[in-house]
Amino acid sequence: MIDINEIHTFGTSHTQGGGFEWNDTNNPKKLELLDKFYSHLDIPKKQEFFSWPGQLHQKTGVEVINHGQSGFGDEKIYRSFYKLLEDKNFYNSINKKLFIFEFAEMGRKEYFCNSINDYIILNYWGKNEQGHFHDYEKYDENNLDFAFTNDFYNHNVILNSNELKNKYFNFFKKSWSPHIYQQKISMDAIGFISFLETLSINYLIVNSPFFRLYDMNTYISWGITEKEVEFRNGKGDMLGMVTKEKLTISDETNGEYQDGHAGYEGNNIISDYVIKKINKTYNLIK
């Protein structure tokens, strides 16, 4: 049994606890619905307690540091992880830590912005007469739409400059290619996971990397499936389980609160599967 003192989770809003922004005072309707459906729960009304990492902490007693952030993707995962390694004390005790990753799909591109001295995230998708669509092969610079910010729920720091937004988005449209972006996302994930393996870092994956152009096992002989959490519908498919098993907030509130993130019970189930995989792979938690 490995002696572990910390678990670090990385990912998108699905790891942060999306939909449970109890501090989003700019959205009174959301707060009203959260209070209606979840105020009876005997837990603090904070996002962290409704997320699966928060429930993981409650069930295991192990400190869980949640680096997930709404809107961001794999580039944020890599930045956050490497930032931790800059601390020599942290690195020297890395064998006592477990890292859990929720990789994102396409649709997220990160830039550093000098004018705010921070990273900004561009979320993009296709748009036609029927609305939004997510078939990346059909995207072109004429049918892309986007959201652009450095914090989706802290409305004080959302980028309000349309000129700045349009500059980045116009550059993105001119430099974007579905094949090239799929290739880059795949290669970056292969490199990152290979790095984890080289350092013998304890890690698990709840949502598998985006691989459309490469067979993961061709590049990493051990096979990624050994580290993927096994959910009801298959390995490394946390988001798929939430949708297929009707575990979203929308499902949990009978459609009254429309939100595709995991509900409280959905996150509870996710944390149970994560604990099961932790025990099976590392024998860390009893």
Task: Briefly describe each language-model feature range.
Residues 1-82, 89, 269:
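Serine-esterase "nucleophile elbow" of acetyl-processing enzymes
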Residues 82-286:
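Alpha-helical cap/lid subdomain in secreted, periplasmic
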